[in-house]
Amino acid sequence: MATVHSPIPALYTVYILRSTVRHASFYVGSTPNPPRRLSQHNGLVRGGAVRTSRGNLRPWEMIILVSGFPSATAALKFEWALNNPHLSMHIPSAERLVVSTQRNRNGRPRRPAKSLASVASSLHLLLRVPSFARWPLCVQFFNRDAFAAWEKWCAGVSLGERGLRESWKVVTDFGEGVTSGGSGEVAAAEGEDEAPAPWGIHALPLDYEPMKEYVAKGQEIFEFERQGRCVVCREEMKSGEGLHAVCTHEGCDGVGHISCWSRSFLKNNDTGSILPVQGQCPMCKEEVDWADMMKELTLRLRGQKEVDKLLKRKRKRATKKAKKT
């Protein structure tokens, strides 16, 4: 198994595009920077994809975004499954909603055409299958038609089927009352000096700035060796020994072994899952998201460059002094 040397990314997403010219044309991709990627697909900057380069389909709009992937590899797995729900091994054969009725020249099943209904149903199904059901994902809708298709599908799901877990985040942002250049790029109205606040993909945080205070707290605790006793098992924690995670809440300096946090979060879990989602901090009694804790932990262990940039630290550089002989 390959060794991971990078922290959990600030943002990595799987997106769904729809042509504003031909609404029956869709494209699924993944990116850490949705605004830049949309510009590439629309030919505004270099890049994009062959399938979105046809001028008679541009401009494209990002109608749905799934964020929260812990790595590019994780996002690519989800992207492939969403693009190929008729083939994906993540979906049990008996639960497939999309079935191919034709084959390509190489004999492989041909990818069925997409529609809003098929995209919404496949997305809902993937969020429920065991492979992805406990991932810390958030689904964002930037288009009313797409959200209506999602709600219609959710309303039709039978009670006997696996539903989405309660902690799933589903967000809508339709940019009411603004003039958009596509999926949230806001233009100033005539006679106005400043444009309204951005919405949609242009309002997404692309860096670690939202967790700056949390990261700073963790740095201070471990730099000054203030970790103390584990908030779960009460054992004294030694600096530099083991993996220690910090409570996400402001004002709480609760620290614990990662294994203890995990065991505490899973103690009331009756599904046999091994991946925690949420739990209560024993010190402050507030709800803590496992994904946020792991993002800070990986930044602390594997993201010194990112931490220095976030906290505006000057990195120490080794300098070589020439010796005069």
From Swiss-Prot:
Domain of life of the source: Eukaryota
Chief localization: nucleus
Entry-linked InterPro entries: GIY-YIG_endonuc (IPR000305), GIY-YIG_endonuc_sf (IPR035901), Slx1 (IPR027520), SLX1_C (IPR048749), SLX1_endonuclease (IPR050381), Znf_RING/FYVE/PHD (IPR013083)
Molecular function, one GO term: zinc ion binding
Database matches in PROSITE patterns: GIY_YIG
Cofactor: a divalent metal cation
Cellular component terms (Gene Ontology): Slx1-Slx4 complex
One annotated GO biological process: double-strand break repair via homologous recombination
HAMAP family assigned: Endonuc_su_Slx1
Protein's recorded name: Structure-specific endonuclease subunit SLX1
Organism per entry: Chaetomium globosum (strain ATCC 6205 / CBS 148.51 / DSM 1962 / NBRC 6347 / NRRL 1970) (Soil fungus)
